[in-house]
Amino acid sequence: MKRPFSIVALLLLGFNAAAAAEATLLECIAVVESGQNRKAVGKAGERGMYQVGKAAWDDANERLKREGHHHFQWSKWRDATAQDMIAAAHLRTIRENFKRIGKPDPSPEQLALVWNVGWSGAVSRRFAPNDYAERVGNLFRSQKVLTR
C-alpha cells in the first residue's frame, strides 16, 4: 500500500505513534473507498480519496476551526493536504462520539463502519461491522503500525 498521507498534515497534527496509527487507518479507508484516488467523485457527490461528503466536510472544517487549524473550503477538495486534514478531523469526531458513549477505544472496524454508514447507521447496527468495515479492519491489521 502506498503512503499518500500528506507530510504537511502529519506535521500539523503532530507526528507520534497515535498519529501514525490514525494515518494508517485513514490510508486503509482510502484504499477501500477509492483505491487511494485523490480525484475520485462518488455517486452521491463524495469527494477525494476518502470519499467525504459535503456535510461531513463542513463538520470537519468546523472542528479544524475550533482547534485553531487552517480550514478548507469545499472547492479545495482536490488538495491533498485539505483531504488529509479533513479526513483526520472527521476521524477525531468519530472517536469523540465513541468516547461520549463510553467506548474510548473503538476497533478499526467500528471506526470504519461509522465512516461508511454514519453515526446513526452504525448505532442502528449496534456497531456490528459490515463488509466494508471488515475490509478496512483486515487491511489495517495487515500493516505494520505502532498502536497506542
Regions found by a protein language model. Give the residues of each.
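Short, low-complexity, polybasic intrinsically disordered segments
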Residues: W115, V123-Q143
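Hydrophobic h-region of N-terminal signal peptides that target proteins for export
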Residues: L10-A18
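N-terminal, post-signal-peptide region of Sec/Tat-exported proteins
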Residues: V41-E67
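Short, functionally critical alpha-helical segments immediately adjacent to catalytic or ligand/cofactor-binding
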Residues: E22-N37, V52, A87-A88, L111-W119
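Solvent-exposed, acidic/flexible segments
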Residues: E22-A23, G42-Y50, K76-D84, P104-P108, ...
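Sec-dependent signal peptide recognition
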Residues: K2-L10
